[in-house]
Amino acid sequence: MLAVAATLSGCASLTTLYFHPQEIWLQTPDRFDIDYEDVWLTADDGTELHAWLLKPEPTIEQAKVILYLHGNAENISTHSRSVFWLVEKGYTVLALDYRGFGASQGRPILPDVLMDAKAGASWLRDAYPDHSLVVLGQSMGAALAVNFVADYGRDYDVSQLILEAPFAGFRSVAREMLQRTVVGTIVLPLVYLIPSDWDPKDRAPNIHIPVMQLHSRMDEVVPVSEGQALYDALPESMRCYVASQGPHIASFRYNKFREQVADFLVRG
């Protein structure tokens, strides 16, 4: 029990509970005929980060660039397929690996990971000064995206935010997951040791740009109730909601949801 308490207490708990990085790439974008290049970034604390710049055909390039923040496990080699369709529609996408993921150095822990999102946005601003910046986050990446845009969105002129399967709070989503197992219910009271400083629902009211949120009622990882709690915290005039389909972070497998996101990008 003491070991569990040590795991859950303080910021270090977030590494164990929420981040499950993998160093090895399982595939690269060229396997899917996506042009890309390796990008190396430096976070404010000096941590070296890696990303893939996914590049569209020059003839269809859009005047928007997208910072893609993936989920809490594996790395960009398994997550980037979620956004290849955006590249095919002409959008340049920077797929970032947080510290400890893929080739990025360091250890994933909050709030340090928020510096990684900032580094990605800074690189895109410098590389594409005449393009509008959009942030897209899935699951854990959505939680990071909300925090980043709430704190730094104006500094980096972020124009739109897209969230898929976000959760409202770190404690609440941990509670939801622990309740699913017998062992989890035993340690459930220790959830209250988890810091709530970066709960997306508390940061959401500070977002004043258009936000599209997608969430499937079939999501077995992040319950739709978590997403709804976050959505309710967003400024009403800025938000739109898409009830998608499929398992966790699978909305973009469906063309109809891709088209809704594409329309949102064009309108913004």
Where are these regions (language model features)?
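An N-terminal hydrophobic leader/cap segment in hydrolases
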Residues: 6-43
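Membrane-embedded segments
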Residues: 44-123, 131, 149
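Short alpha-helix in the alpha/beta-hydrolase fold that links the catalytic acid
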Residues: 82, 200, 209, 223-232
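Gly/Ala-rich beta-loop-alpha elbow adjacent to hydrolase catalytic centers
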Residues: 137-141, 145
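Hydrolase active-site cap/lid region
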Residues: 147-203, 209, 253-255
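Short beta-strand/loop motif that positions the catalytic acidic residue
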Residues: 206-208, 213-215, 219
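Acidic catalytic loop of the alpha/beta-hydrolase fold
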Residues: 218-222, 248-250
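Catalytic histidine neighborhood in serine/cysteine hydrolases
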Residues: 228-250
